[in-house]
Swiss-Prot record:
Gene that specifies this protein: Slc10a2
Name of protein: Ileal sodium/bile acid cotransporter
Intracellular or extracellular location(s): Membrane
Keywords: Glycoprotein, Ion transport, Lipid transport, Membrane, Phosphoprotein, Sodium, Sodium transport, Symport, Transmembrane, Transmembrane helix, Transport
Membrane spanning residue stretches: 29-49, 88-108, 127-147, 158-178, 196-216, 225-245, 285-305
Single GO MF annotation: bile acid:sodium symporter activity
Protein's membrane topology: Multi-pass membrane protein
Reaction catalysed by this enzyme: taurocholate(out) + 2 Na(+)(out) = taurocholate(in) + 2 Na(+)(in); cholate(out) + 2 Na(+)(out) = cholate(in) + 2 Na(+)(in); taurochenodeoxycholate(out) + 2 Na(+)(out) = taurochenodeoxycholate(in) + 2 Na(+)(in); tauroursodeoxycholate(out) + 2 Na(+)(out) = tauroursodeoxycholate(in) + 2 Na(+)(in)
GO cellular component: apical plasma membrane; microvillus; proteasome complex
Chain segments carrying region Disordered: 327-348
Length: 348
């Protein structure tokens, strides 16, 4: 028999019907390259987002952290509880329930900052919430996991990658701080950088989703219940975050910001924790869940963006008409109204 008909083209040694095929390291190389490229791009995008953050307003959120406190309740109150309820209600395996809870306990992702710009959110609040949630995750993640995972597993077996959290914090704070400085010193140049960065950020979000699908295409076969949870979880976060912020008396543009910060999780951190905490056998059951959550949090974020753009075009209104002027919240029209003209309806 002709060996060429049975041997793999990648075979390095053939003897009869027996072939030795070297293991492909394409995914490992692609993962390393793309991880490096995406990290650099993300830092550049966060620098551009920082160009829309005003130092005085950012410090104002720190000094009067009512918006941050609402976000904290959503991030480490609503999301872990929602994950727990979904896990119990669906009756999934213990290891799967733990992964769902890990996702619920993660801090907000930087993608929320990019999307907050596109829906005319409060960029100062968005950046401060992401920074604070990442910092507080150092203590809140172990606490939330201890509270909610006791019925399934010893929380001590879950490895919290404090180094990854620290890197995420540095990768967020440094570029944004530089962007804030540029906005303070050269506001006109900052607007140009912001426009370019906002478009690059939108492309980056899509690129991350595509790369994830390519790298882990063989892992998409997973229990249907996890697909259902991965669909419900992000939209529940968006909805509950919005309504809690509204219940707390926050203006509409901040409600949208809190909604995004609540539903959009740091899925990369979740994937890291899962890989560090579970055996290869368990990983086969759960590894895809962070990818599923990533896909649906982006899908629903795109839907929210589309609804917002449609609403503005149909009604011709901006947030200034909806800002409640109270003694506790006498903010002027947000600066993003003057910067982000992309979704302003045409005026005669």
């Amino acid at each position: 028999m002709d060996n060429s008909s049975v041997c793999s083209p990648n075979a390095t040694f053939c003897e009869g019907d027996s072939c030795l095929v070297t293991e492909s390291n394409f995914n490992a190389i692609l993962s390393t390259v793309m991880s490096t490229v995406l990290t650099i791009l993300l830092a550049m995008v966060m620098f551009s987002m920082g160009c829309n953050v005003e130092i005085n307003k950012f410090l104002g959120h720190i000094k009067r952290p009512w918006g941050i406190f609402v976000g904290f309740l959503c991030q480490f109150g609503i999301m872990p509880l929602t994950g727990f309820i979904l896990s119990v209600a669906s009756g999934i395996l213990p290891v799967q329930a733990v992964v769902v809870l890990i996702m619920g306990c993660c801090p907000g992702g930087t993608g929320s900052n990019i999307l907050a710009y596109w829906i005319d959110g409060d960029m100062d609040l968005s950046v401060s919430m992401t920074t604070c949630s990442t910092l507080l995750a150092l203590g809140m993640m172990p606490l939330c996991l201890f509270i909610y995972t006791k019925m399934w597993v010893d929380s001590g077996t879950i490895v919290i990658p404090y180094d990854s959290i620290g890197i995420s914090l540095v990768a967020l704070v440094i570029p944004v701080s530089i962007g804030m400085f540029v906005n303070h010193k050269w506001p006109q140049k900052a607007k140009i950088i912001l426009k370019i960065g906002s478009i690059a950020g939108a492309i980056l979000i899509v690129l991350i989703a595509v790369v994830g699908g390519i790298l882990y295409q063989s892992a998409w076969i997973i229990e249907p219940k996890l697909w259902i949870i991965g669909t419900i979880f992000p939209i529940a976060g968006y909805s509950l975050g919005f309504f809690l912020a509204r219940l707390a008396g926050q203006p509409w543009y901040r409600c949208r910001t809190v909604a995004l910060e609540t539903g959009m999780q740091n899925t990369q951190l979740c994937s890291t924790i899962v890989q560090l905490s579970f055996s290869p056998e368990d990983l086969n059951l759960v590894f895809t869940f962070p990818l599923i959550y990533t896909v649906f949090q982006l899908v629903f974020a795109a839907i929210i963006l589309g609804m917002y753009v449609t609403y503005k075009k149909c009604h011709g209104k901006n947030d200034a008409e909806f800002l409640e002027k109270t003694d506790n919240d006498m903010d002027p029209m947000p600066s993003f109204q003057e910067t982000n003209k992309g979704f302003q309806p045409d005026e005669k």
